[in-house]
Amino acid sequence: MALEWAGSPSRLLSGIVNGRSQAACVQAVDEQTHQRRVCGNQSLTPALSLTIFQAMNAYIGRVVDLLEPNNNHFDNVSLEEARQRVLSGSPETVRAIEGSFALLACQGQMVRMARSMDRPMRYFLAKREDGPTLIVADRIDSLYAWLKSEGLEGQFHPSYTRMVPAHHVVELHLIGCPDPAPQYTRFFTPVRNRFSTDLDEIGRAYIGALADELAKWLRHVPEREPVGVCFSGGIDSGAVFLATYHVMGKLGLNLSRLKAFTLSLGDGPDLRQAREFLDRLGLGLFLEPIEAELSSLDAVETVRVVEDYKPLDVEAASMVLALGRGIRARYPQWKYLLDGDGGDENLKDYPIEENPELTIRSVVNNLMLYQEGWGVGKFKHSLTYSGGLSRSYTRTYAATRHHGFDGFSPFTRPGVIEVAEGIPFTELTGMSVPKLYALKGEVVARGIKALTGLDMPVFPKRRFQHGATRVEQLRRQMPDREAELRNEFLAMYS
């Protein structure tokens, strides 16, 4: 059910009415009808009556909160305390919230919103005769459905929606006309280059932070619930699986609850890699392949689910949907899934040569480039989508929720990102692209060794969608044409 708030304009009267008459002139808003009324006016001059009439006709800001409170998971605060922290607007106070969250808080005409990396959050500002209405949800189609229910769908276009960027408090004042301009306050600013060049030290810190986040998350999972890891045998999913295996053992949890789910579309290399990874460590019994047909991939369905059209993200989300569909068919009650999304972003392990906008200098020298894109206020920053993983996390979030899973990647947590940003990439790589690509395996393998004592196999990087099936097969099923995917998305609202 939507929660609604109406900002009473009674505060607008404060200071307009003189001390003698102020007590007798109170404007109220009926909580059910949102109708305005002025009570107790007995002796007003014409000038004062006009002033109060203008105040009475001031806009009433209205907020509709479509976010699901149960979708927030906090480690150290209650929901109400978390909202109060967002309301405060204090970056330090919001940064101290531990967990997954998408929150808004209101006071008067002011609205503040904030989210963690793994909880997409969107808003739309609708115009009504009595003032603006701010609608907030985790999905574009939820915003549209509410507008349609109110007969306001004529105002809607998906490009008019806005995404709350991760790691920022967004402040709006519902003043009616002109449209309010959002103000952004960063609440997470990791210190860059704070570590030495000792890879063992870096690995211990990085995987140690990963294990800490997994321990917090596992404590919220009911003790009889199974835990699945979306597993390819790559560096990130491998680290998540081995750290989870280790932490569950340390916490005295039953390891028979743990599975490594690997998607296979028939001819991809991931299943062989996953099997080799686990067999080398004597952990092959945890592997559970999930087979699917390549023909089951549907780019149009994926665009509808993730509400985005970037080809690489649509491909990756299609794999998550296929994996989730297979797990759900086999285990109708399964709920909890872990994955390694965000690991590439943290250790800057994307092919620079595939993006003509990037150089190794821009990748290494820009704070959280892969997590946030070029950044709020920058020329290329998208108000509709934000940037980086802040935008693309819907490939995991929306795809897992579509099949009823509660997913989590510890790589998205600030405590883990903070360690990654502290790595002195320039010193360690000498601005060499091959050295940058090799660094991730070195850091993670050393960290896993320090945490678990296991020698983690490290295989060459491969995207999820290129491991579940061969690239040429994928391309026949899902053409790499962004314009077509964008048109499919826009057609949903045409």
Q: Which residue ranges define each predicted feature?
A:
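ATP-dependent adenylate-handling active sites, centered on carboxylate activation for C-N bond formation
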Residues: 2-3, 14, 109-112, 191-452, ...
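Non-catalytic structural connector segments
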Residues: 482-484
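Cysteine-centered catalytic environments shared across enzyme families
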Residues: 2-20, 25-28, 34-290
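A short alpha-helix-loop-beta-strand transition element characteristic
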Residues: 453-462
